UniProtKB/Swiss-Prot annotation:
Keywords: 4Fe-4S, Cytoplasm, Disulfide bond, Iron, Iron-sulfur, Metal-binding, Methyltransferase, rRNA processing, S-adenosyl-L-methionine, Transferase, tRNA processing. GO terms for cellular component: cytoplasm. Pfam families: Radical_SAM, RlmN_N. This is Probable dual-specificity RNA methyltransferase RlmN. S-adenosyl-L-methionine binds at G164, E165, S194, S223, L224, H225, N299. Disulfide bonds join C110-C342. It is an enzyme of class 2 (transferase). Its main location: cytoplasm. Specifically methylates position 2 of adenine 2503 in 23S rRNA and position 2 of adenine 37 in tRNAs. Its cofactor is [4Fe-4S] cluster. It comes from Synechococcus sp. (strain WH7803). The gene is rlmN. The active site is at E97, C342.
């Protein structure tokens, strides 16, 4: 159920919740089912657009301040590869970015979980502006609906890899996953939650997911970005509070609770963490997990002078991991020409 602070917002509620809510408003459960259809299938943005509802009831809801909870598009950038970045505004005046990443076979939506981010990873633009607040469930779901509306395609995949640290907003993220799965028909196995790691939260995520979702079939992607603690602290300031071994232990705990393997992410920074010796060290760390490692070539941001690795360095790093029996892939940098790639999202319109 939505929080008290958002009790007049309908987006994020499931079919049975909308039925109960309609009855509580003196209407039939059928009106709740109509609302569900218009919120999720038809993508209504305003209650006054739902003309199948009685006009008097719509007016009454408007007087009470009841809203759907959609976000307002403030800017749009379309890259040469058709990746689309949206700057969206919230009801309280905050802004966030979300990205639609299309291929012939799928449409992936990269959603934000917070306005800004407190983790301050040196290679990421989002953390440069700090954290304003966490997003509500409806604000996460609304991002997917905005991308669907703009790109005129049904999203097939959702990745929590936009602005913010999802594990600092666990309850809203899990409620959003429930809504995306049940109400928008996006399978859990097509949803990925990415985290840089927050102490003591992975076991809690596992337990809450089992409790709220009945199962935890979404993919958990843990961002390592370094093969050892000292280099990780250099790149991720908050890592000093979360020793590497403790993070990996929590990954094992997550696997034990959910039965789902953890995948790992590693951003390659030219001349800093992309040496074959780093790959060997990383293989030592993650080899026992039988997990997948996703390599990401650094995407430039204005505030830092990190270098994108050469193709030879990337392939060399990959070959070392593969020679050690580690499953590995390289993520394509989509939307790079419009600052829509991994690590480039911000809270405000960019010139």
């Amino acid at each position: 159920m939505i929080s008290t602070a958002q009790s007049k917002t309908l987006l994020g509620l499931g079919a049975s919740e909308l039925e109960r809510w309609a009855v509580s408003q003196g209407q039939s459960a059928f009106r709740g089912r109509q609302l569900h259809d218009w919120l999720y299938a038809k993508g209504a943005c305003d209650l006054q657009d739902i003309t199948v509802l009685p006009k008097a009831w719509r007016a009454s809801l408007q007087d009470k301040g009841v809203i759907i909870g959609r976000l307002k598009e403030q800017d749009r950038k379309v890259a040469g590869d058709a990746t689309t970045k949206l700057l969206l505004g919230t009801d309280d005046g905050e802004t966030l970015e979300t990205v639609g990443i299309p291929t012939d076979q799928r449409l992936t939506v990269c959603v934000s979980s917070q306005v800004g981010c407190p983790m301050a990873c040196r290679f990421c633009a989002t953390g440069k502006g700090g954290l304003q607040r966490s997003l509500y469930t409806h604000e996460i779901v609304a991002q997917v609906l905005s991308v669907r509306e703009v790109m005129e395609r049904r999203p097939s995949h959702v990745v929590f890899m936009g602005m913010g640290e999802p594990l600092l907003n666990i309850e809203a993220v899990l409620d959003a996953i429930r809504c995306l799965n049940d109400d928008l028909g996006i399978g859990q196995r097509r949803i990925t939650v990415s985290t840089v790691g927050v102490p003591r939260t992975l076991p809690r995520l596992a337990e809450l997911a089992m409790e709220r979702l009945g199962r935890a079939q979404f993919t958990l992607a843990v961002s390592l970005h370094a093969p050892n603690q000292s280099l990780r602290e250099e790149l991720i300031p908050t890592a000093h509070a979360y020793p590497y071994d403790a993070l990996l232990d929590d990954c094992r705990h997550y696997l034990a609770i959910t039965g789902r393997r953890v995948s790992f992410e590693y951003i390659l920074l030219g001349g800093l963490n992309d040496h074959p010796a780093h790959a060997e060290e990383l293989a030592d760390r993650v080899g026992g997990f039988q997990s997948h490692v996703n390599l990401i070539a650094y995407n430039p941001i204005e505030e830092e002078e990190f270098q994108r690795p050469t193709r030879d360095r990337i392939e060399g790093f990959r070959r070392v991991l593969e020679s050690r029996g580690v499953a590995v892939s390289l993520r394509a940098s989509r939307g790079l020409d419009q600052d829509a790639a991994c690590g480039q999202l911000r809270r405000s319109r960019q010139k």
